[in-house]
């Protein structure tokens, strides 16, 4: 049976990790089950989909192969397709070896920007399960698991914010109580921290924490809590930290290919959910070394950040100008609409007033016409009435003992006289006055002055003789 030393060597060769203590810790956590340890290291919480890998070719061709497996990352804040721009700082960072090519082949791109020697590596170390199992079988490291039982996972799944809170709390507990200075790690997921750095136009300082590594206490307490380092990092960076025992910290260590600890990196957002790796620092560093590295990165990146800030400010200014122009346009439009509405309301008011005036004029005209018709009708009725009453009077009788002579004086001074039989009713005298047509009203009374006697409508049934008007009478007309 292959001993633990051989398993450790194969695990380092396949994963690319140089830290023997970390590799031993991972293998121990999986009961020295090599296949399970590699599978846990190279996969997410769900089983990774496999992709075909061309196993032919020699060592010098491994940078030109493109065979990747896209993983499924449930936790928030992890992107499944991100590039990092890598600087080789002469620290001995090496690329994947021959055995690494069997599992995943990162794309290597060399480009220059801001004086930085840059390469690109994808976020995520992904394994094709079938190829991995076959390769380990060929090497003689098949799983020793029996009865289908599974070892416990190395990484427990929790929310990105919860993991960040736990990391900050543990870091403060272990190193913050004895140090007056500490880095302001954000309590949020990696992608949220990346977005924060983008919006604040700062670089993102990443620290991956290996709690059991022998160099971790000295590095955290002596370097990360150094006054000058803390002041510089808090001033110039957004800082995010994660434990490699957490889901997001573990995946970031895979994505950044962290092979030595303590591990720090400086990244910045790039297009299409990608990040640029500007610097990675592996292994213990003194405060002076760390500060020099970070100062150089800030100096080199300053033109880009200043340009981004200026462009963002220009965009905000342009947006504000557009909003002000839109607001002015809307205000002018609303004013025009208000004026148009006022003009329309005034027009409608004038139209209503004109219609009302026309209606009243029409009503007045109709009233005049109606009054004229009624007057004509009344006049015609009076004419007919006079004619009818004149006919009803009959012929004037000749003077005689039973004939009464009546003289009527009208208000205008005109006098009219006629002979009536003494038995004639006073009603006939009224009919006689009406038949003359000299009055415009029917509301009048016949009176005598000496003595004053009113022969009103209540006496119409009396005869002239009974009323004392025989043989002659002089009557006046009094308008009621």
From Swiss-Prot:
GO terms for biological process: lipid droplet disassembly. Keywords: Coiled coil, Ubl conjugation pathway. Residues 47-78, 335-383 are annotated as: Disordered. GO terms for molecular function: protein-macromolecule adaptor activity; ubiquitin binding. Residues 330-389 form a coiled coil. InterPro entries: FAF1_2-like_UAS, Thioredoxin-like_sf, UAS, Ubiquitin-like_domsf, UBX_dom, UBX_domain-protein. SUPFAM superfamilies: Thioredoxin-like (SSF52833), Ubiquitin-like (SSF54236). One of its GO terms (cellular component) is plasma membrane. Residues 399-477 form the UBX domain. Residues 336-383 have a biased composition (Basic and acidic residues). This is Plant UBX domain-containing protein 10. It comes from Arabidopsis thaliana. The lineage of its organism: Eukaryota, Viridiplantae, Streptophyta, Embryophyta, Tracheophyta.
